A protein has these predicted regions:
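Basic, amphipathic alpha-helical bundle interface domains used for macromolecular binding and assembly
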Residues: 1-144
Length: 144
């Protein structure tokens, strides 16, 4: 843990701001690897992604080829509408974690995608909370 913290301390905030997802993945216990438990099938995941891409194609227009991850700051403000609870969660995270404008926009892009997977409009608090959870290094560096 100390070596990890030392290494992470060498990564600049502006570099982390350019990475959409920071996820810590714990080791998988051998029992889980050797067991017969099945997760979500690739076919089911593919259907979810196809739904989200269809939602995005409707949003941006046919033939635009634009995906949420490529939205400009202007498009983020246009298409990433949050309900009041979502606004409150995002505001609290920005103030508590000291997030930059770039991190704020990346959270909105990811939250928009999470909402699209559920065909939800507007973006709700749970979508924002999940997107914030994917910013593990922001939280880890801020709470050191």
């Amino acid at each position: 843990p100390l070596a990890i913290d030392k290494y992470l301390g060498r990564i600049s905030g502006p570099l982390l701001d350019r990475i959409d997802l920071h996820i810590e993945v714990p080791p998988v216990p051998y029992e889980d690897l050797a067991g017969s438990a099945e997760g979500t099938s690739s076919a089911a995941l593919r259907r979810l992604v196809e739904v989200a891409r269809t939602v995005q194609a409707r949003r941006f227009g046919p033939g635009a080829g634009l995906l949420n991850g490529r939205m400009t700051p202007r498009q983020i403000r246009q298409y990433c509408r949050l309900d009041s609870h979502g606004q409150a969660v995002l505001k609290h995270a920005v103030e508590t974690l000291g997030l930059s404008a770039r991190a704020h926009d990346r959270i909105l892009r990811v939250a928009r995608t999470i909402a699209d997977l559920q065909e939800a409009e507007p973006i709700r608090a749970e979508h924002v909370a999940e997107a914030i959870a994917y910013r593990a290094l922001d939280r880890r560096l801020w709470t050191r």
